[in-house]
Amino acid sequence: MSDLRRIVIKVGSSSLNHPEGGLDDQAIQRIAGVIAGIRQLGVECVLVSSGAVAAGVGKLGLKTKPKDMAGKQAVAAVGQGVLIEKYALALEARGLVCAQVLLSRLDLAEASRYRNAQNTLEQLLRYQVIPIINENDTVAVEELCFGDNDRLSALVAGLVHGDLLVILTDVDGLYSANPKLNPQAELIEEVEDLTQVMHIAGGAGSSMGTGGMVTKLKAAEITTRFGMGMFLLHSKRMEEIIELIQGERPLGTYFFPAAHRIMGKKRWIAYGGLSEGSIFIDEGAVKALLKGKSLLASGITGIDGVWERKELVRINNPDGIEVARGLVELSSEELEKVRGKHSEEMLATIPNLEGEEVVHRDNMTLMIE
């Protein structure tokens, strides 16, 4: 990994919490020290940091974080200022400048906003600024949240074309079973095939965090399909990120990049955009898609949802499992009229189409291999 150009680090609230409440200032200082060390190696760094809610809980003297949405958002609004101020002071002491970037789900769901976020982050990195990214908890709608910063960090890694994502956590990596419940659990140091380990992840997070191992494996799916490696590292050994960059392999779990990676617009189609509905297809159409073909009307058996032309839809097999997603050339109303029909009949029914494809392969990303 000695040829890394850009690294994304995600630190969760469990790594930032002080045992007595609020933020652990020492943890902030350690993170700043790691970032400074990374920059001294000539590697650019983006930080995705939780902690706003925990910081707000400490600032307001609360014993636990609120459970309702309004309470969480109010506490996050208080805490985000505390969090970024601590980071700014710690980095400034090391000669570095940081920038706060708060992203909502819609910032990555809409293609134009996705590009704007991408351009802003690229400019910050050209200025040699450390972007510190968090979800914009204060205005997020529950149905349109990232859910956790593990997923956000993976999307950010794709957004900035990173080379490696490091997720700091409160365990040494991925285990064969939950190490907190099973003392015989063994650390899995390398993962080449995610499908072989998805079943072993425990879903529980900490009291202040929202992400368990399931969310980290989802982040690994996104990151590795983007063509990047991902490393799970215990936050108590965060300084070993420097060793990782220098080509050594510290204790933890490394997820290898997928053999078939997705690039450019197809990254946004797969994981950035929000789908408006579903198209159901027969087995023949599934086989065609897996061979790199476009989706034609003849293979479509049903639809669910309402959408207009050029919007994003899921494409499901007969069992309802998503096999692809893409930008559809027909509205849901138009597609209902022509589903199951051959191309000639479709074009005769809806004459103002540019081609016979319902979803062109250039505007489609496979979600299974």
Swiss-Prot record:
Pfam annotation, one family: PUA
GO molecular function annotations of the record: ATP binding; glutamate 5-kinase activity; RNA binding
Pathway(s): Amino-acid biosynthesis; L-proline biosynthesis; L-glutamate 5-semialdehyde from L-glutamate: step 1/2
SMART domains tied to this protein: PUA (SM00359)
Subcellular location: Cytoplasm
Record-linked InterPro entries: AceGlu_kinase-like_sf, Asp/Glu/Uridylate_kinase, G5K_ProB, Glu/AcGlu_kinase, Glu_5kinase, Glu_5kinase/COase_Synthase, PUA, PUA-like_sf
Broadest EC class assigned to this enzyme: transferase
Residues binding substrate: 50, 137, 149
Catalyzed reactions: L-glutamate + ATP = L-glutamyl 5-phosphate + ADP
Any single GO BP term: L-proline biosynthetic process
Listed EC numbers: 2.7.2.11
UniProtKB keywords: Amino-acid biosynthesis, ATP-binding, Cytoplasm, Kinase, Nucleotide-binding, Proline biosynthesis, Transferase
GO cellular component, one term: cytosol
Domain PUA stretches: 276-349
Residues that, per the record, bind ATP: 10, 169-170, 210-216
UniProt xrefs under NCBIfam families: proB
Family per record: Belongs to the glutamate 5-kinase family.
Role according to the record: Catalyzes the transfer of a phosphate group to glutamate to form L-glutamate 5-phosphate.
HAMAP family reported for this sequence: ProB
Protein name as catalogued: Glutamate 5-kinase
Organism: Desulfitobacterium hafniense (strain Y51)
